[in-house]
Amino acid sequence: MAQQNFLVEGVSGTGKSSVCRELRSRGLFAVDGDNELAYRGDPYTGEPTEAFGHEYHVWDAARVREIAARPEPELAFFCGGSRNFSMFLDVFAEVFVLTVDASTLARRLAEREPDDWGGTVEQREQILRLHATQEDVPAGTLIDATRPLAEVVDAIVTLATSDAG
């Protein structure tokens, strides 16, 4: 296994993809799970489905485990949201949950393109409801993602490297 694997989670609009890009720009190994691991599947079985919706956004659990089992790099960050996280949560040393207040989330979602997740009124309403309930987010260390991106990533890297040491 990589010396330490970390999951960066949070509801849509909290900054998971931005964190992933920033980690990569710093030369750290980061997987954009929503683009590299995701497919439409049953969150309990992992079986592919034609069904569409938030609840069917799952990651390839075998691929997560495969990447996490690599001996290199020293630190590996998996960024994104998955409805089947319980199928692979055990490979992570820690889960970092990005949090923002409702007004920041609403502003970020309003800036999305109509074809991006959260770009329609219905999707924004669902995301704001999920933000209020946190029902699809694993427990973890809360990271205030209303701060500038560099500060958010600094906090994650500091916590990850203190855990790895």
Model segments located where?
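Short, polar loop motifs at secondary-structure junctions
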Residues: 80-84
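Conserved substrate/cofactor phosphate-moiety recognition/catalytic segment
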Residues: 21-65
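Small-molecule kinase domains that catalyze NTP-dependent phosphoryl transfer to phosphate-bearing small molecules
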Residues: 85, 114-165
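Conserved Walker
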Residues: 18
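Hydrophobic anchor at the beta1->P-loop junction of P-loop NTPases
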Residues: 8
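Loop/turn-to-beta-strand initiation segments
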Residues: 72-77
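Conserved phosphate-donor/acceptor-positioning beta-strand/loop module used by diverse small-molecule
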Residues: 91-111
